[in-house]
């Protein structure tokens, strides 16, 4: 189900791409172990750097590592000392030449991994979990490319004895739609009561034919034309609404205009009948 599976793996090869790009035959398991070790090394050594993603690409005698970070200054260090140290550690681990590329993330509020890390840091600093979740949602929804977000926290929330899960959602987050561009992030907050897992899903529109649809930015029903009432005045309909033909000034005026000729005709008919009766009495006085 789309609600249970990792969104990246669910859409792999459809709307998302592989984060490790290389080919191996007999060394496949060794390369997989190396990739896990590289990501673990960067995650533990650069916790405050705000790393959003790590991409690994291998050639015959070289390993290229792309680090997407919101704080490139921490990764580079003063005069590049930190970057040199990271490169040396990676070369020692892989025993190959390492090309290290540090890329800056322009909008960290719209990256799920960075949003989850921000919420986890607030939870570690004893901020109320509901306040941290709502603040993250408000910051993400201000971005023009974000159409919906869901944030979930699981663990001993608020120091409760029994663990539980709570989530907040705003906008659309279609987890089971394969063409939907869903960004997913997971981070664990270390608190005095134990670990609290933070998961974030961010919906950024649909991808059709390799291009993101711009129609997802418009709210539902925005293209539907509005029906306007004609400019001319029209009498209100009577019936279930409780409005009768004479309950308004316009209705009373219309009713009075229609009743005046009818009353005049009735009066003329009465006078004619009275005149005919008087003539009959004059012609037959004895009767």
Curated annotation (Swiss-Prot):
Matching SMART domains: KH
GO biological process: translation
GO cellular-component term (any): cytosolic small ribosomal subunit
Region (Disordered): 216-287
Keywords tagged on the record: Ribonucleoprotein, Ribosomal protein, RNA-binding, rRNA-binding
InterPro entries, sorted: KH_dom, KH_dom-like_a/b, KH_dom_type_2, KH_sf_prok-type, Ribosomal_S3_C_sf, Ribosomal_uS3_bac-typ, Ribosomal_uS3_C, Ribosomal_uS3_CS
Keyword Electron transport among record annotations: no
PANTHER family per record: 30S/40S RIBOSOMAL PROTEIN S3 (PTHR11760), SMALL RIBOSOMAL SUBUNIT PROTEIN US3C (PTHR11760:SF19)
Summary of the function given for this chain in its UniProt record: Binds the lower part of the 30S subunit head. Binds mRNA in the 70S ribosome, positioning it for translation.
Oligomeric form and interacting partners: Part of the 30S ribosomal subunit. Forms a tight complex with proteins S10 and S14.
UniProt cross-references to NCBIfam families, sorted A to Z: rpsC_bact
Name of the featured protein: Small ribosomal subunit protein uS3
Organism: Mycobacterium sp. (strain KMS)
């Amino acid at each position: 189900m789309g609600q249970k599976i990792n969104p990246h793996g669910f859409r792999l090869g459809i709307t998302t791409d592989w984060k490790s790009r290389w080919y191996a035959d007999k060394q496949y398991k060794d390369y997989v172990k190396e990739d896990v070790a590289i990501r673990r090394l960067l995650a533990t050594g650069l916790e405050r750097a705000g790393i959003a993603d790590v991409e690994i690409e291998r050639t015959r005698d070289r390993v290229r590592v792309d680090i997407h970070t919101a704080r490139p200054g921490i990764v580079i260090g003063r005069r590049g000392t930190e970057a040199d140290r990271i490169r040396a550690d990676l070369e020692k681990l892989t025993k190959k030449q390492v090309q290290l590329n540090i890329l800056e993330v322009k909008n960290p509020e719209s990256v799920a991994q960075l949003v989850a890390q921000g919420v986890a840091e607030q939870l570690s600093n004893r901020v109320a979990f509901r306040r941290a979740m709502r603040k993250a949602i408000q910051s993400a929804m201000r971005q023009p490319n974000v159409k919906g977000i869901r944030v979930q926290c699981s663990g001993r929330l608020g120091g409760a004895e029994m663990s539980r899960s709570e989530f907040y959602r705003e906008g659309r987050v279609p987890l089971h739609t394969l063409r939907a561009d869903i960004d997913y992030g997971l981070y664990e907050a270390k608190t005095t009561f134990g670990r609290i897992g933070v998961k974030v899903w961010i919906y950024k529109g649909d991808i059709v034919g390799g291009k993101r649809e711009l129609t997802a930015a418009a709210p539902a029903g925005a293209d539907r034309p509005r029906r306007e009432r004609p400019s001319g005045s029209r009498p209100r309909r009577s019936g279930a609404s409780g409005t009768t033909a004479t309950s308004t000034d316009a209705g009373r005026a219309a009713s009075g205009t229609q009743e005046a000729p009818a009353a005049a005709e009735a009066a003329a008919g009465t006078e004619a009948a009275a005149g005919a009766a008087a003539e009959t009495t004059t012609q037959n006085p004895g009767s």
